């Protein structure tokens, strides 16, 4: 179902100086055809940082490599890692960084995915000059690492915001997505994920407050129509299920 996605697929699309996105998919989750998105950043040292890599494509790899050497690949939460194994095969010198608790998942261990480093709230020296990061916690081992690209004032999320366009979804799903507040303009994560994050609500609210304090101009995330402008206002609306943020 190509209607769910944002063509052209599996190609670099410039967003800001040193920052690109790659739209791909669709993936099917809980019967919903989901568009999926990777973010690509060129760090100050000229190396390339891949956030939530999408399906591997040789031409895409070639185009990214033309920007600089791929040195970092990020699995930002416990759900976004499935395409990394093939990228590792083709980028053997790149380090793979993972959200907390990903390494412990049985499916990940059985896959043979190599995890070189585990992320936390402190940006590592490899990209501290370019990116800030915040771990948003939840129950049941859920963690999502959010990143802020200071030069472009872009916040990079994964599943904390899901903003599906009804016109791109099957007609039968549209009322369900609206009821679940997963479609534009609400842009909330699925109900089960909201429940999981609420299990650690106090810590999650603190983390989200840190993200809002960064005042991002734009917010990129994995699924749906990302916030190209007025990022802080849109983010506050999408995360209001956690509480009121001033």
Q: Which residue ranges define each predicted feature?
A:
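Generic, well-ordered alpha-helical segments
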Residues: 33, 56, 75-79
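Short hydrophobic/charged patches on amphipathic alpha-helices used for structural packing
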Residues: 61-62, 208
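Active-site HxH/HxHxD metal-binding segment of metal-dependent hydrolases
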Residues: 63-126
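Short, well-ordered alpha-helical microsegments
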Residues: 57-61, 81-85, 105, 142-144, ...
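Cap/insert and terminal regions of metallo-dependent hydrolase folds
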Residues: 16-17, 29, 54-56, 67, ...
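Active-site neighborhood of phospho(di)ester-bond hydrolases with catalytic His/Asp-centered motifs
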Residues: 51-52, 71-78, 97-99, 156-159, ...
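Short active-site segment of divalent metal-dependent hydrolases/proteases
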Residues: 80, 162, 226
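Catalytic core of the metallo-beta-lactamase
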Residues: 1-53, 111-179, 206-207, 213
